[in-house]
UniProtKB/Swiss-Prot annotation:
A motif (D-box 2) lies at residues 52-55. The keyword tRNA-binding does not apply. Residues 38-50, 88-98, 110-119, 231-245 have a biased composition (Polar residues). InterPro entries: Securin_separation_inhibitor (IPR006940). This is Securin. Ubiquitinated by the anaphase promoting complex (APC) at the onset of anaphase, conducting to its degradation. GO terms for cellular component: cytoplasm; meiotic spindle; nucleus; separase-securin complex. The N-terminal destruction boxes (D-box 1 and D-box 2) act as a recognition signal for degradation via the ubiquitin-proteasome pathway. Interacts with the caspase-like cut1, and prevents its protease activity probably by covering its active site. GO terms for molecular function: endopeptidase inhibitor activity. Its main location: cytoplasm. Belongs to the securin family. Residues 1-55, 82-120, 218-284 are annotated as: Disordered.
Amino acid sequence: MLPRTMFSYGKENAFPVTPISNRNGTKGAGSKRAPLGSTKQSNAPSSVTVPRTVLGGKSTNISKFISAPSTKKMSPMDISMDSPTILEPNSQGISRSAVQERSKRLSASPRRSSLTDTPLPNELEEDIEYMPPPVHLDPIQSLGFDDVAIDCETLDPWPSMQNKATSVTIRNTPASDFHVYKEFSDDDPIQFPLLSVDGDSPLTEKDTNLTTPATLKASDQQRKVLEKPSVSKQSSSRTRLSTVYRTKLASGKSIPRPLSHKLTRPRVTASGNSRRRPLSRSIHSLSSSRIDFSSLDTGLL
């Protein structure tokens, strides 16, 4: 009877094995009951000395497979300080003295407490805790514009209007073209210019030192108006109902002319007769004032 070929279960490096049979050609009955990992010679003759391995409930003679040495070069990052391989030479032909010297150099280097310390040039490859410095918080420096210098204090995006002279030109007639220079400041009070409003003269600022043809003409007209008598209506301080008309003469004197008899009602007595002033008396009072109406202007009346 040819031996039956079987395969192991759960192994990566599986290879075919041949189970050992009894003298009568059957498998051992007690092989399935053997515990896992047992090396007992279950139902095997005394002449067999190969250790038995129970895998997946079946008895096999699998021996430990020794893999070939790795050809990958170990880097310093993969070697731990407590690893025994650092003290033993590997199969690459490294001498024991070189390994011991390297282990002494690594053990002598102090541990770094901070990750932001700048390492020495010879420790860049050996220090596994080295990290580059963080990005700078300044956005201009993080963009790489280190050579650009911007002076933001001297820039004035909103120029103020203080202490700046502005030229204002007033144009009404060809004779009144002049410039008024003003300085704006928050502390200066608001001042309104005094303007003379006349029919023939333009709007000009009153200045006693400024002599122009327009101002001379305006002063002449004002002098003529003052020489003419004018009638002004004033309210009396004694009573609000009575009105007194004063006539101004060329000499500057004013003569009151009462007109209360025209504005007030006649008084009625208990008998029903009304008391009226005689007309001759009022006419006599008007004629005694001796007013020269020839010099009065009809437009002012």
